[in-house]
């Protein structure tokens, strides 16, 4: 069963809808695993493998927890293929919570999806495609597991465009922990809360894109692309055509005005201009 709630129609020209490469998956929380830090990381939800899953790690049953999935160019999503729960084994599936209802949204539209309580993959056709670069998968209701952890898990949400998976098995083997870089991957925003003018995307393939989009039409914008590396402590950036620059990256959690958690990334470097060296938030 699929219930689609259309808030505003977003129509992009067909020429603008590139087959965007997968960019990142960023979660509001993940279940900690002492011996394997990447065991329940958000990238597991897009690799198309039953042996891996994302499990949220917030207090409660997981309702309201989310994963933001980003692409490196605009895409049109007309189908998702969902494998519910922790599907690596029947025991793990029954022990952990599964998702009963989730929402899939972009900035302007939202679909509500009701799932079955099964380990088998479920194909969900979207009545109206979602278009853009950034999509949010959010847990709305759960099937309660038999274990004590009370963690809700999703094994896979594969995004499909015109019958072609844009995430899934093609990414298997490419989505390791990245030496802690998974904590930085995602879209970051700088400027007034709710009205940012600067955007920084850090992708799983170790590339980045920075954009300055001023509200003043008389002021020129800016775009910088390049590479980044992060070993869990030291951040290095290489804007296209320039040398590598060492920077510090401080990541911390804080609360926003609406009471929901947000992450704050502060990048500082002597040889990096103010475009990139500033304070960033993972929420607009």
Tell me the role of every PLM-derived stretch:
Residues 2-13:
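Bacterial N-terminal signal peptides
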Residues 16-72, 90, 94, 163-186:
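Disordered, acidic Ser/Thr/Pro-rich linker "stalks" and the adjacent N-terminal cap
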Residues 61-64, 88-168:
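Trp- and acidic/polar-enriched beta-sheet ligand-binding modules for extracellular glycan
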Residues 62-64, 72-81, 132-133:
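Extended extracellular/luminal ectodomain segments enriched in beta-structured repeat modules
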Residues 65, 75-78, 100-102, 198, ...:
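Short beta-strand/loop motifs in extracellular/secreted proteins, especially
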Residues 75-93:
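A short beta-strand element within beta-rich, extracytoplasmic domains
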Residues 137, 157, 165-223, 234-284:
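Lipid interaction determinants
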């Amino acid at each position: 069963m699929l219930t689609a709630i259309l808030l505003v129609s977003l129509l992009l020209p067909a020429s603008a809808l590139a087959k965007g490469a997968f960019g990142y998956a960023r979660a509001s929380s993940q279940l900690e695993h002492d011996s394997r830090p990447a065991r329940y990381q958000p990238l597991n939800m897009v690799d198309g493998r039953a042996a891996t899953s994302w499990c949220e790690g917030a207090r409660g049953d997981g309702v309201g927890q989310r994963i933001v999935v980003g692409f490196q160019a605009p895409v049109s999503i007309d189908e998702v293929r969902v494998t519910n729960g922790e599907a690596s084994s029947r025991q793990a599936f029954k022990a952990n919570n599964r998702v009963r209802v989730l929402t899939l949204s972009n900035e302007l539209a939202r679909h509500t999806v009701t799932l079955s309580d099964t380990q088998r993959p479920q194909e969900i056709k979207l009545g109206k495609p979602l278009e853009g670069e950034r999509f949010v998968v959010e847990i709305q209701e759960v099937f309660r597991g038999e274990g004590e952890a009370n963690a809700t898990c999703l094994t896979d949400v594969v995004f499909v465009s015109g019958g072609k998976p844009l995430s899934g098995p093609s990414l298997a083997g490419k989505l390791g922990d990245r030496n802690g870089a998974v904590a930085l991957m995602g879209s970051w925003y700088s400027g007034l809360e709710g009205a940012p003018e600067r955007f920084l995307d850090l992708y799983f393939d170790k590339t980045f894109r920075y954009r300055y989009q001023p509200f003043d039409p008389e002021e020129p914008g800016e775009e910088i692309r390049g590479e980044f590396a992060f070993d869990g402590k030291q951040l290095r950036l290489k804007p296209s055509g320039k040398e590598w620059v060492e920077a510090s990256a401080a990541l911390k959690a804080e609360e926003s005005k609406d009471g929901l958690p947000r992450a704050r990334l502060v990048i500082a470097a002597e040889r990096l201009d103010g475009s990139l060296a500033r304070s960033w938030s993972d929420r607009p």
